[in-house]
Amino acid sequence: MNDKRTVSMIDLALQKHGTPVGPLYVAVRHRRIKKCFTRDTAIRYLAFFMTTEAFERSGFPQRHPRVRIDRDDMEVWRDGETKAEYLAAHQRCVRRLRRILARKREMEKWCAKWDAMHERYVKERDELKATKPDGVR
């Protein structure tokens, strides 16, 4: 369950659904959707969506130019390899997503501890109020 103290956009971008065969992770970002069986794969796809969108908006090329190859008197065009800058940006995005998710887990743990402490405090306060003598203000 999402707590309003820790909810963020990453909850919409990386969703977990329970299915009879196990968890299903869904990466949704920039009009693209990918369903995965592992969290690691979903994080990589989410980073791929985000990095691709950033490169498209900035105008930087993601790949090297296409290469013409002559095979058996036929002209064949092969797509260029992915650029090193794109791969580095993708890896940075994966690291940042993992860091955000780790920080979110820590916040949720702290909120659970806080809620437990607060419930104990309220219970103890109610008990003290119930046993309060008449003359005490």
What are these regions (language model features)?
Residues 1-137:
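Intrinsically disordered, low-complexity linkers and terminal regions
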